[in-house]
C-alpha cells in the first residue's frame, strides 16, 4: 500500500530524486592525503644544512670580500683623493700667486725701492743665478740634452748591484758577518755542504730581528722558513729629469725584481684576562713576495755652502766637549725615492687555531699585503726618501782643528767612536721628507705646479705676436747647443722651448744689468695680479717666483741689451721632455 503511494509521489515530481551512494571505509580512507615519507631526523638535518649554507654564503659575500676587488677599490679611492688634493693645491697656488703679484705691483708703484735697499734679496738672486748656471754648465760639458737624449740601459749597474746583493745575501744566510773573516787568498772551502747550517742561521738571524720588540699579548716569534731568493733586480731606462725650477736634476731608473722571497713564522696570541694566558690562539703566517717593479728616483742634494751653521752628526750633544769633538755633517746627500705608481705582487698564507683550524683566510692575506704596501709608501715613496749621507771630505778649518784636537786627546780610548758616530769618512743612512712646494717637480712630471699654472694662464694668441726677439751675447754664442745662459737653462728645465728659432737668450751678466737698470720693477702691459704677458730675458714665459729672476718689459730690455749681437742660429726649438 505504501509503495504505490511513494511511486505516485515520484511520478508527480518533475524529476526523480537522487540518493548518494554510501562509500565503504576503504574507499573513504583512499581519498585522504598520504603521510610524509620524511622522518623527523631527516627534516632536522636538512634544515641545519640549509642554515649552514646560508651562513657560509653570508660570511663569504658579506663579511669577507675578494682581494682583487678590495685592491681595485683602494686604488680608485687613492686616485680620487690625489686628484682632489691636486685641484685644491693648484687653486690655492693660483690664488697665492695672484695676491703676491698684486701686492708686489702696488708696493712697487707706491714706494719704488731701489735694488741697493735690498742687499739680502739681491745676494739671494745672485746665488740662485750662480747655482742655475752651474747646473746648466754640467749638462753642457757632459753633452746631455734633456729634450732629445734617449733612455739608457744600465747593464753595468745590474752586474755591479748583483755582486753586492750576492755578498750581502751570503752574510744573511750565514747569520751575519763573522769577526774572523778571511780574504779570498786564504779562504779554505769547506768540504761539507752548508745548506742546512745556512738555513738555520738565517732563521736565527730573523728571529733575533723580529723578537727585538716584545709585547704581553704575543709569544716569542719562531721563524719556520726564511728564503731570500736567488734572482737580482734589473735596472733599465735610465734618464735625467729636472727636479725643480732652479735647475737641479734627478736620475730616474725603472727597476723590476721577480723572485721568491718567503718568510714564515709561528707564534701564539695570548689573552691575559681574567688571568695570564687565559686563552691561547696558535697563529702561523707566511708572506711571499713574487714581483716588485717601479721607478727609482736618485737625486744628489747639496745644501747651501755659505750657511753659517751646518748640521752636526750629533743633534743633541750631552756636553760642550762632545759637541766640539763632533764634526759638522756633510752637506752632500743622495736621496732615493720611489714613484707612487709602483707594483707589488705578493701572497700570504695563514693558519689559525689548535683543534679546529682556519686556513688561508682572505682577510688576513689582504691585511698583510696592505700593511706591507703601506710600510713602503710611508718610508720610500716620494716625497719621502731614503738618504745616504756622503763623506765630508773637505771640512771647514775651524771644525777640522777642533776635531783633530779631540781625536788626538782620545786616540787610545775611543778611536773608533768617530766612525760609529758619523764623523769623517763615514757614510750615514737615514730617512726624510722632501719639500713639496710649487717649485718642485714631482717624479714622473715634466713641469712644476707653478710652471703648469703659468703656461695654462699664458696660452693666448696675442702673446706670440707681441713678443720681440731678444739677442744673444757673445758668451752665450759660444754654446753650440743653446745652453749658455741661466735663462736658457731654466727655460730648458721647464720644457717651454716652443717659440720660433730666432728668439735668443741673454747671459747672466745681461740679466744682472737688466735688474740694475730696471730696479726690479717687472713692468708689463697687464693688470696687477695677472700671470700672463710677462717678459723674461731669454724669450720664455715665467714668473718672478718661478724663475728667480727680476723681470722687465721688452721696451726696457731693448734699452739695455746690445743691438748688434744677433746670432744666426739662435736657440733650438725644444719640445717638452719625453718620458
From Swiss-Prot:
Homodimer. Component of the ER-mitochondria encounter structure (ERMES) or MDM complex, composed of MMM1, MDM10, MDM12 and MDM34. A MMM1 homodimer associates with one molecule of MDM12 on each side in a pairwise head-to-tail manner, and the SMP-LTD domains of MMM1 and MDM12 generate a continuous hydrophobic tunnel for phospholipid trafficking. PROSITE patterns: SMP. Residues 311-328, 465-476 have a biased composition (Low complexity). The chain crosses the membrane at residues 44-64. This is Maintenance of mitochondrial morphology protein 1. GO terms for molecular function: lipid binding. It is a single-pass type I membrane protein. Pfam families: MMM1 (PF10296). GO terms for cellular component: endoplasmic reticulum; endoplasmic reticulum membrane; ERMES complex. It is found in: Endoplasmic reticulum membrane. Residues 1-43 are lumenal. The SMP-LTD domain is a barrel-like domain that can bind various types of glycerophospholipids in its interior and mediate their transfer between two adjacent bilayers. Keywords: Endoplasmic reticulum, Lipid transport, Lipid-binding, Membrane, Transmembrane, Transmembrane helix, Transport. Residues 65-579 are cytoplasmic. Belongs to the MMM1 family. GO terms for biological process: aminophospholipid transport; intermembrane lipid transfer; mitochondrial genome maintenance; mitochondrion-endoplasmic reticulum membrane tethering; protein insertion into mitochondrial outer membrane. InterPro entries: Mmm1, MMM1_dom, SMP_LBD. Residues 150-391 form the SMP-LTD domain. PANTHER family: SMP-LTD DOMAIN-CONTAINING PROTEIN, TEX2 PROTEIN-RELATED. The keyword Transmembrane helix applies. Component of the ERMES/MDM complex, which serves as a molecular tether to connect the endoplasmic reticulum (ER) and mitochondria. Components of this complex are involved in the control of mitochondrial shape and protein biogenesis, and function in nonvesicular lipid trafficking between the ER and mitochondria. The MDM12-MMM1 subcomplex functions in the major beta-barrel assembly pathway that is responsible for biogenesis of all outer membrane beta-barrel proteins, and acts in a late step after the SAM complex.
Amino acid at each position: 500500500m505504501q509503495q504505490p503511494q511513494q511511486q505516485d509521489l515520484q511520478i508527480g515530481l518533475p524529476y526523480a530524486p537522487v540518493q548518494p551512494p554510501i562509500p565503504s571505509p576503504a574507499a573513504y580512507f583512499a581519498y585522504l592525503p598520504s603521510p610524509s615519507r620524511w622522518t623527523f631526523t631527516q627534516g632536522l638535518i636538512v634544515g641545519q644544512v640549509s642554515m649552514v649554507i646560508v651562513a657560509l654564503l653570508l660570511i663569504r659575500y658579506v663579511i669577507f670580500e675578494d682581494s682583487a676587488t678590495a685592491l681595485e677599490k683602494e686604488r680608485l679611492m687613492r686616485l680620487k683623493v690625489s686628484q682632489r688634493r691636486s685641484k685644491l693645491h693648484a687653486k690655492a697656488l693660483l690664488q697665492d700667486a695672484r695676491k703676491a703679484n698684486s701686492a708686489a705691483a702696488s708696493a712697487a708703484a707706491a714706494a719704488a725701492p731701489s735694488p741697493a735697499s735690498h742687499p739680502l734679496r739681491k745676494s739671494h738672486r745672485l746665488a740662485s743665478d750662480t747655482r742655475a748656471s752651474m747646473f746648466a754648465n754640467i749638462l753642457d760639458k757632459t753633452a746631455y740634452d734633456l729634450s732629445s737624449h734617449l733612455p739608457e740601459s744600465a747593464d753595468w749597474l745590474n752586474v755591479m748591484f748583483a755582486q753586492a746583493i750576492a755578498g750581502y745575501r751570503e752574510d744573511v744566510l750565514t747569520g751575519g758577518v763573522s769577526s774572523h773573516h778571511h780574504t779570498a787568498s786564504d779562504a779554505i772551502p769547506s768540504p761539507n755542504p752548508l745548506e742546512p747550517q745556512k738555513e738555520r742561521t738565517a732563521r736565527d738571524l730573523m728571529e733575533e730581528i723580529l723578537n727585538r720588540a716584545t709585547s704581553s699579548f704575543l709569544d716569542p716569534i719562531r721563524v719556520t722558513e726564511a728564503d731570500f731568493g736567488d734572482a737580482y733586480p734589473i735596472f733599465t731606462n735610465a734618464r735625467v729629469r729636472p727636479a725643480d725650477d732652479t735647475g737641479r736634476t734627478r736620475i730616474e731608473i725603472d727597476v723590476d725584481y721577480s723572485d721568491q722571497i718567503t718568510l714564515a713564522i709561528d707564534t701564539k696570541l695570548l689573552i691575559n684576562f681574567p688571568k695570564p694566558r687565559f686563552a691561547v690562539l696558535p697563529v702561523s703566517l707566511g708572506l711571499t713576495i713574487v714581483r716588485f717593479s717601479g721607478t727609482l728616483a736618485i737625486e744628489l742634494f747639496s745644501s747651501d755652502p755659505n750657511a753659517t751653521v751646518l748640521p752636526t752628526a750629533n743633534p743633541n750633544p750631552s756636553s760642550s766637549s762632545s759637541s766640539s769633538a763632533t764634526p759638522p755633517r756633510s752637506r752632500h746627500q743622495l736621496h732615493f725615492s720611489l714613484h707612487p705608481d709602483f707594483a707589488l705582487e705578493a701572497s700570504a698564507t695563514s693558519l689559525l687555531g689548535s683543534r679546529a683550524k682556519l686556513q688561508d683566510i682572505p682577510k688576513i692575506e689582504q691585511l698583510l699585503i696592505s700593511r706591507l704596501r703601506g710600510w713602503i709608501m710611508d718610508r720610500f715613496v716620494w716625497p719621502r726618501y731614503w738618504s745616504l749621507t756622503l763623506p765630508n771630505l773637505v771640512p771647514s778649518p775651524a771644525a777640522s782643528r777642533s776635531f783633530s784636537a779631540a781625536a788626538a786627546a782620545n786616540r787610545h780610548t775611543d778611536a773608533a767612536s768617530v766612525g760609529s758616530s758619523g764623523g769623517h769618512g763615514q757614510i750615514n743612512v737615514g730617512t726624510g721628507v722632501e719639500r713639496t712646494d710649487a717649485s718642485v717637480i714631482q717624479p714622473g712630471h715634466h713641469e712644476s705646479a707653478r710652471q703648469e699654472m703659468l703656461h695654462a694662464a699664458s696660452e693666448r694668441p696675442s702673446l706670440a705676436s707681441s713678443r720681440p726677439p731678444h739677442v744673444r751675447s757673445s758668451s752665450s754664442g759660444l754654446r753650440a747647443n743653446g745652453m749658455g745662459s741661466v735663462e736658457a737653462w731654466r727655460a730648458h728645465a721647464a720644457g717651454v722651448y716652443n717659440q720660433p728659432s730666432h728668439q735668443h737668450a741673454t747671459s747672466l751678466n745681461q740679466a744682472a744689468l737688466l735688474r740694475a737698470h730696471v730696479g726690479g720693477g717687472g713692468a708689463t702691459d697687464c693688470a696687477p695680479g695677472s700671470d700672463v704677458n710677462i717678459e723674461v730675458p731669454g724669450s720664455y714665459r715665467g714668473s718672478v717666483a718661478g724663475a728667480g729672476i727680476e723681470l722687465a718689459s721688452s721696451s726696457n730690455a731693448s734699452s739695455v741689451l746690445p743691438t748688434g749681437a744677433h746670432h744666426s742660429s739662435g736657440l733650438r726649438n725644444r719640445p717638452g721632455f719625453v718620458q
